């Protein structure tokens, strides 16, 4: 399953995404966790956060986590 499909599936099948996080590669920090509740939308190449300015390329996502459980991993 592609990362875009995994994100969309979670949004449409889960009522509560407050404990789900994207783990991304960050050039400065190494890895970062982004709460799913901060995601506004996703297209074929990018994830757009609801702060109005942050855009994350899909290739930077390495994992989707819920608490200690891995839902998707590259």
Curated annotation (Swiss-Prot):
It comes from the Archaea. InterPro entries: MJ1316, UPF0248. Belongs to the UPF0248 family. This is UPF0248 protein STK_06965. It comes from Sulfurisphaera tokodaii (strain DSM 16993 / JCM 10545 / NBRC 100140 / 7) (Sulfolobus tokodaii). The lineage of its organism: Archaea, Thermoproteota, Thermoprotei, Sulfolobales, Sulfolobaceae.
């Amino acid at each position: 399953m592609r990362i875009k499909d995994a994100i969309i599936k979670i949004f449409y099948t889960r009522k509560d995404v407050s404990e789900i996080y994207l783990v991304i590669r960050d050039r400065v920090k190494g890895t970062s966790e982004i709460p799913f509740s901060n995601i506004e939308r996703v297209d074929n190449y990018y994830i757009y956060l609801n702060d109005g300015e942050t855009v994350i390329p899909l290739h930077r996502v390495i994992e989707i986590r819920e608490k200690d459980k891995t839902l998707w991993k590259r």
